[in-house]
Amino acid sequence: MLERLSGQTRLTALLAAPARHSLSPKMHNAAYAKLGLDYAYLAFEVDNSGLAAAVQGMRALGICGANVSMPNKQAIVPLLDELSPAAALAGAVNTVVNTDGKGHLVGHITDGTGAIRSLAEEGVAIKDQIITIAGAGGAGTAIAVQLGLDGAKEIRLFNRKTATFKQAKQVLKGINAKTSALASLQDLADDRAFRRSIAESSIYIDATGVGMKPLEEHSLITDPALIRPDLVVFDLVYHPAETKLLAFAREHGAKKVMNGLGMLLYQGAEAFKLMTGEDMPVAYIRELLCRDKE
């Protein structure tokens, strides 16, 4: 990487805590090298206490873009100059672009577009469909927003009654006001409503994190009757590559089972495009990530 750095090198970054585990530096720097772009991507350990200073640093240093992850996705919103329509609806940001290089910072959310591009890659259409999502955290609500913007018929979100539940209610109000979709939020503890919703949906998305460590032996769906030959099951977890849910859905004849690797790649590709104006070489990056996991 050092031989690529110059006095003209443009800096992109990750603002997160923790940041060390992220695959984003590997993805973006590999893409820069592949395309011969004079950019470098660094991960910075930044939590809410240092976020305002980090954003000022972006302006002062002319950092051309940054990815934003936990715990900063919502906290960064009031620090920016402008939001994309999806970010405004979601009330959260995962990508910031310094649009003029002079400090005008625009926030975007690419989780939803990443998920929908991943579905499209597998031939799964979302227009006019009923979709159930378990988990109303940042990823779940971002996907709900993009589903609404892209023409889903109904979006049924389920979550435990925590602080996240209250926040998600506000997001869904925006979806109902700004899109043609009918968005609803119900308690994940209401098993009857959850089962009925899955039975009426063509796509089930699990955005809870159940299935990754330390919950790798768990699944929200354990009844074979909920798995139908016309149901797509999409788990946002990508490590392990096949969660308990996906193995169960495959075994019992789901139409299609998908993990979160495609979403990871495509949300990164959307951010890459926003920050550089270039298309990320997705096939190359996918191969690189899969090879590293072997």
UniProtKB/Swiss-Prot annotation:
Its EC number is 1.1.1.25. GO terms for molecular function: shikimate 3-dehydrogenase (NADP+) activity. Keywords: Amino-acid biosynthesis, Aromatic amino acid biosynthesis, NADP, Oxidoreductase. SUPFAM superfamilies: Aminoacid dehydrogenase-like, N-terminal domain, NAD(P)-binding Rossmann-fold domains. Signal peptide: none annotated. The active site is at K73 (proton acceptor). Gene3D superfamilies: Leucine Dehydrogenase, chain A, domain 1, NAD(P)-binding Rossmann-like Domain. NADP(+) binds at G135, A136, G137, G138, A139, L236, G260. It catalyses: shikimate + NADP(+) = 3-dehydroshikimate + NADPH + H(+). PANTHER family: BIFUNCTIONAL 3-DEHYDROQUINATE DEHYDRATASE_SHIKIMATE DEHYDROGENASE, CHLOROPLASTIC, SHIKIMATE DEHYDROGENASE. Belongs to the shikimate dehydrogenase family. Involved in the biosynthesis of the chorismate, which leads to the biosynthesis of aromatic amino acids. Catalyzes the reversible NADPH linked reduction of 3-dehydroshikimate (DHSA) to yield shikimate (SA). HAMAP family: Shikimate_DH_AroE. Homodimer. This is Shikimate dehydrogenase (NADP(+)). It comes from Streptococcus equi subsp. zooepidemicus (strain H70). The gene is aroE.
